[in-house]
Amino acid sequence: LIMAYAHIAHDCIIGDNSIIVNNVALGGHVEIGEYAIVGGLSAIHQFVKIGRHTMISGGSLVRKDVPPFVKAGREPLSFVGINSIGLRRRSFTDEEIGEIQDIYRVLYQRNFNNTQAINKIEIDFKVSKNRDEIIDFVKNSGRGIMRGYNQK
């Protein structure tokens, strides 16, 4: 669903069942995964990738890649939590949601750099499609992923 006055530049890829709310501006070559929601008045920098099942708050400036299954907000854009309500609506099990939550705790809340976090996730979590999707997204991020929330 693409709402009123949204601007979608050249060569963008928007996944199925995604929602682009009013007055969103997408730069060129932006990729948005399935079931993503981009809040109104948000601006997405060129070449940014937004993962599946994400929710980006309105008025956000998205300069970095946003991994799958998360909620993102604040300025600068940062991790707010996982999109648990959206995942439940799409029939993710409690076990899958718990696994995703635990993976993002390692990635964003344990003071590891991305390489250290990915190594720990690969060791500590059994292979699953959601784990592998998160790992692949972070490893293949061209612009780097958004940061974790810092209260400072």
Residue locations for each model-derived region?
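Structural signal for interior beta-strand "rungs" in well-ordered beta-sheet cores
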Residues: 1-74, 78
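Terminal amphipathic alpha-helical/low-complexity segments used for targeting or macromolecular assembly
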Residues: 69, 75-152
